Swiss-Prot record:
Name of the molecule in the record: Para-Rep C10
Sequence motif RCR-3, residues: 79-82
GO CC term (a single one): host cell nucleus
Cofactor note: Divalent metal cations, possibly Mg(2+) or Mn(2+).
Length: 283
């Protein structure tokens, strides 16, 4: 499955002798840690990043530490301040932000009176409705089939860290190979975005609402080859998204590479995109 990404992390850093000095980068929103001793000395800590960060990046930030996603941040913070095994600390860096509180309030408003929200702010209503529908679909869908060889190859590829250049192109000319079904399955997972293509402005506006996601572009058979938006594909992969619809803005997300997968019934047009960017997976 895709690389582990998270904002909230727990860490344990074993040491002997002098307490290791921890120097945080600007990517860290908040951290709390303390010196503990059970069978050995270690630092027990919690980190809140400013954006979703891969396990690989976290290991570079804190070499030698054991790291896990923190699924309950408040409990993790409390755990890093427990008295029973504490020797020194706790120490803090930055300011903790209660993530998701704004989303929770919006969803509470939606749950209480969706019709009122629909009248007051139709756009917000549609986004909340979409979130509710996606949650329902995620709860009742699973992959209960044997993987085809190309699906297995694709999964193994996206288990690796994405680079800043490679675009995955899943090619099946005949139809019925399972491309669309698999694209929809992948994008049921958190951190993935699905589109069937369309106008560049519409695609970029939609993606700009959640611009840290991996991407599946599922091209319908009826779409003519010349209408594929290679510029959109490259913008997303290059991490510079220029949205000109409604509220024009440029979103830069340098260094946060994402997987971009195109599912199509034809091969890429290498006169419109660099051939060395494309990794073709044949169905």
């Amino acid at each position: 499955m895709p690389s582990i990404r998270a904002i909230h992390w727990c860490f344990t850093l074993n040491f002997s002798g002098k307490i290791p000095e921890i120097v945080w980068t600007a990517d860290v929103q908040y951290s709390i840690w303390q010196h503990e001793r059970v069978n050995h000395d270690h630092l027990q800590g919690y980190i809140q990043m400013k954006k979703q960060t891969t396990l690989k990046k976290m290991k570079e930030l804190l070499p030698g530490a054991h790291l896990e996603m923190a699924r309950a941040p408040k409990k993790a913070i409390d755990y890093c301040q427990k008295k029973e095994t504490a020797i020194d600390g706790p120490w803090e860096y930055g300011t903790w932000i209660s993530t998701g509180s704004h989303k929770r309030k919006l969803m509470e408003r939606f749950d209480e009176d969706p019709e009122e929200m629909k009248l007051e702010d139709p756009g917000l209503y549609r986004r909340c409705l979409s979130r509710v529908q996606m949650t329902k679909v995620r709860e009742k869908n699973s992959w209960d089939y044997d993987l085809r060889p190309w699906q297995d190859e694709l999964l193994k590829t996206i288990e690796q860290e994405p680079d800043d250049r490679t675009i995955l192109w899943v090619y099946g000319p005949h139809g019925g190979e399972g491309k669309s079904v698999f694209a929809k399955y992948l994008t049921l997972k958190e951190g993935w975005w699905y589109t069937a293509g369309g106008k560049a402005t519409d695609m970029l506006y939609s993606y700009s609402l959640d611009p840290t996601c991996h991407v599946c572009i599922d091209i319908p058979r009826c779409t003519k080859e010349e209408y594929i938006n290679y510029a959109v594909i490259e913008q997303i992969k290059n991490r510079i998204i220029i949205n000109t619809k409604y509220e024009p803005c440029t979103i830069r997300d340098d260094g946060h590479n994402v997987h971009v997968i195109v599912f199509a019934n034809y091969l890429p047009d290498v006169t419109r995109i660099s051939e060395d960017r494309i990794k073709i997976i044949y169905c």
